[in-house]
Amino acid sequence: MKKLFALVATLMLSVSAYAAQFKEGEHYQVLKTPASSSPVVNEFFSFYCPHCNTFEPIIAQLKQQLPEGAKFQKNHVSFMGGNMGQAMSKAYATMIALEVEDKMVPVMFNRIHTLRKPPKDEQELRQIFLDEGIDAAKFDAAYNGFAVDSMVRRFDKQFQDSGLTGVPAVVVNNRYLVQGQSVKSLDEYFDLVNYLLTLK
């Protein structure tokens, strides 16, 4: 029992230390959206965004730093990419639907930012999946399905409701926008996100 009290006391001190360290308006911004009912970190991104591409390794590390019970969600926005913006959001939703996100996200970023060969149309977009061994029939069913369309609408609605204007953006508990430019190290960035997860 003493150990339990010691652990709780340590956690409370940690949160207090973070509260003193991180300030609203400097390290994070409070959005006008209602807080989520459970802890969640939302990243808004676009495959067409060069900063999002650079941010990917940090996001990969952030996922490993989140406490048990905290959910991570990636949301593709459609406002970048011209006439392919919506199609690329559908492509990302298709990755989720087919459970090939871990495989295909690096492929798509590499295609656009390293090879500099972004798909010109939906046929080329489809071929990228097929070239990576994704079954054509499964791709077509998912890409043209209701679940993917619903996901894309949710991505864009969440982005619009948040009042955000650019990507990458990380929002904690649907309410706290991380202002990463104010932190001095990756560890401090992870501490900031984990602190915001304690807020309602």
Curated annotation (Swiss-Prot):
<keyword id="KW-0676">Redox-active center</keyword>
<dbReference type="InterPro" id="IPR023205">
    <property type="entry name" value="DsbA/DsbL"/>
</dbReference>
<keyword id="KW-0732">Signal</keyword>
<dbReference type="GO" id="GO:0071236">
    <property type="term" value="P:cellular response to antibiotic"/>
</dbReference>
<dbReference type="GO" id="GO:0030288">
    <property type="term" value="C:outer membrane-bounded periplasmic space"/>
</dbReference>
<feature type="domain" description="Thioredoxin">
    <location>
        <begin position="20"/>
        <end position="198"/>
    </location>
</feature>
<dbReference type="Pfam" id="PF01323">
    <property type="entry name" value="DSBA"/>
</dbReference>
<feature type="signal peptide">
    <location>
        <begin position="1"/>
        <end position="19"/>
    </location>
</feature>
<dbReference type="GO" id="GO:0015035">
    <property type="term" value="F:protein-disulfide reductase activity"/>
</dbReference>
<keyword id="KW-0843">Virulence</keyword>
<dbReference type="GO" id="GO:0003756">
    <property type="term" value="F:protein disulfide isomerase activity"/>
</dbReference>
<comment type="function">
    <text>Involved in disulfide-bond formation. Required for the functional maturation of secreted virulence factors. Acts by transferring its disulfide bond to other proteins.</text>
</comment>
<keyword id="KW-1015">Disulfide bond</keyword>
<protein>
    <recommendedName>
        <fullName>Thiol:disulfide interchange protein DsbA</fullName>
    </recommendedName>
</protein>
<dbReference type="InterPro" id="IPR050824">
    <property type="entry name" value="Thiol_disulfide_DsbA"/>
</dbReference>
<dbReference type="InterPro" id="IPR001853">
    <property type="entry name" value="DSBA-like_thioredoxin_dom"/>
</dbReference>
<keyword id="KW-0574">Periplasm</keyword>
<dbReference type="InterPro" id="IPR013766">
    <property type="entry name" value="Thioredoxin_domain"/>
</dbReference>
<dbReference type="InterPro" id="IPR036249">
    <property type="entry name" value="Thioredoxin-like_sf"/>
</dbReference>
<comment type="similarity">
    <text>Belongs to the thioredoxin family. DsbA subfamily.</text>
</comment>
<feature type="disulfide bond" description="Redox-active">
    <location>
        <begin position="49"/>
        <end position="52"/>
    </location>
</feature>
